[in-house]
Amino acid sequence: MPGSASYAILFLGTLLEALVVVCAIKRKVLRRYFVLNLYMVLCLAVSWGRHYVLARDGFGSLNYRYFYFYSDALLTIVLYFSLISLYLSVFEEMRVGRYLRLGALTLLAGTSWFTYAVVSQSSHKILTYFAFELSQNLYFVGLVLTYVLWAAVLKMRQTPTLLVQLVLSLGVYFSFFAACYALSNLHPTLYARVSIFFPVVGCLLPLSWAYAFWRVPNDARLSPARLAMAGVPR
């Protein structure tokens, strides 16, 4: 996405990321969803970094590509922990936070080890390749975990509406990127085409979170189980 379109999308994404944090502070949910807001703050910092490298070296430069892949790996790891924080919120009353944290760290370590085992067979720019592959694998892991979490949410009698909105938006986000990476793995030539849409879709997650923080009342609750039953034909 060369030229002015790149700058426009990056600038829009930066504004939306800042808006998420502002809305969270305004609605007094910053501490409750601290990891999600930390992710947005890091996104904001990375966006400014990408602005700087893009303006200095250009979209097709190696410096921009390296910065993009390394920063994307970092953001994906933090997004993974953002998802785990939603697990902690859903299962808060069950007091299983310790086990969830241990399981999350074990899963991340296992994913990292698997990724390294795959990329270690290639001696060409192994660190960059590792960052790229780790991001891909974490998107697939995040996709599975999000739908497992959603299945658990559907079993609950009442769930905060805001939490439901956040889980659903993450599900859509992980689904898109996992599908794009799956297609690019099947047909490597497609990556250059589908990656054009990454910055655009990247704007949708902060947009949905900002909307949820701003519009959904903190005390609003709904019954996902009833919604699931309502969708089943009798």
Language model segments and positions:
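Non-cytosolic membrane-interface motifs at loop->transmembrane helix junctions
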Residues: 59-70, 125-136, 162-166, 189-199
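Extracellular-loop-to-transmembrane junctions of the mid-late helices
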Residues: 6-7, 123-148, 156, 195-198
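Helix-loop junctions on the outward
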Residues: 30, 46-68, 184-191
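Individual alpha-helical transmembrane segments in multi-pass integral membrane proteins
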Residues: 4-17, 58-88, 104-108, 194-206
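Internal transmembrane alpha-helix with an interfacial aromatic "cap," most often the third helix
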Residues: 17-26, 51-59, 70-102, 113-123, ...
